[in-house]
Amino acid sequence: CIHAAGIPKGVVNILHGTGPVVGNELTVNPDVNKISFTGSTGVGKTIAKGAADTMKRVTLELGGKSPNIILDDADFADAIPKAIFAAYLNSGQACAAATRLLVPAKR
């Protein structure tokens, strides 16, 4: 999708691997100019500390999984599409992404 959109190779790079190995290398490597991370506060602190030595820019979205609570008297036809939109806004990459949906059991 990225290349089909006309974005040149190397502009966007997606790496898979464990945080202690790949994440650490990205954090301390001087060839990496910026890190954007969504996840726990503990990992965010580790990234910030490692990135400080190379003065790289860091964007952190830290926190937990936010619930979206729909009460029994809600208009479900209206609320459910909005809840799904909220969960996937910004591709779900936000500390406040409402990725848990709580509804009454009888609904």
Region spans (language model):
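PLP-dependent aminotransferase-like
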Residues: 1-23
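A general structural signal for stabilizing positions within well-ordered secondary structure
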Residues: 3-6, 26, 49, 92
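Short, surface-exposed connector motifs at secondary-structure boundaries
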Residues: 6-9, 27-34
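Beta-loop-alpha module in the N-terminal Rossmann-like domain of NAD(P)-dependent dehydrogenases
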Residues: 19-25, 39-46
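Well-formed, non-transmembrane alpha-helical positions, independent of function
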Residues: 25-26, 82
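ALDH superfamily catalytic-core signature
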Residues: 34, 40-107
